[in-house]
Design a protein with these regions (language model features):
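N-terminal signal-anchor module of multipass membrane proteins
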Residues: 1-4, 19
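Acyl-thioester C-C bond-transforming condensing/cleaving domain
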Residues: 5-9, 26, 39-176
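Short glycine-rich phosphate-binding loop at a beta-alpha junction
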Residues: 9-20
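A structural motif shared across PLP-dependent enzymes of the aminotransferase-like
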Residues: 23-37
Length: 176
């Protein structure tokens, strides 16, 4: 029984895919149409990919909800995925640098996002000179440790075996 095709009898079903940069990590670009690889039932169902860096899947959900509220579709299938462990970490960091202003903040910079976040922390301390730097940096380190711990609880997380100690999280690199 083709449930998707039955649902879409009046063209009231659509698919929304959230993904940042599959073109680089898995050499696959047109992800909306790629759903037909999961099930041929998706042939003929309108689909599109939504990209907004770390918010790609959230944007896909918002787009689907907007289409339902506008009464354009009755059912929206939303899929979000990333596969980022297909390359070594420095190459992956370069790929992720494309979520920033690449020519200025990503190109040729090893692991650009930790460095960008560090610069943001430095700028925050400059902007708010009364902020207790030690307490602020301690809070950021604790957030990092909590994020790693949260990933360990998700059996599907690609990073569940990664580790970040408090000591590692408090280390501030000086290279740009």
């Amino acid at each position: 029984r083709n449930f998707v095709r039955e649902l879409n009898g009046e063209n009231r079903v659509a698919c929304f895919v959230g993904n940042f940069i599959a073109e680089k990590y898995v050499d696959q670009g047109h992800l909306g149409a790629f759903l037909t690889e999961a099930d041929p039932a998706f042939y003929g169902v309108p689909s599109a990919r939504y990209e907004a860096a770390c918010a790609s899947s959230s944007v896909a959900i918002d787009a689907a909800a907007t289409k339902i509220r506008a009464d354009e579709y009755d059912v929206c299938i939303v899929v979000g995925w990333e596969l980022m462990k297909t390359v070594e970490s420095r190459v992956g960091g370069d790929y992720l640098g494309r979520a920033a202003y690449y020519d200025k903040e990503g190109r040729g910079i090893d692991l650009p996002f930790p460095k960008l976040f560090g610069k943001l922390a430095d700028e925050t301390l400059k902007k708010y000179p009364d902020l207790d730097e030690r307490r602020y940096m301690d809070a950021l380190a604790k957030i990092s440790v909590v994020n790693y711990e949260n990933a360990k609880r998700n059996p599907l997380a690609q990073t569940r075996k990664w580790f970040m100690s408090y000591e590692e999280a408090t280390h501030r690199g000086t290279e740009s």
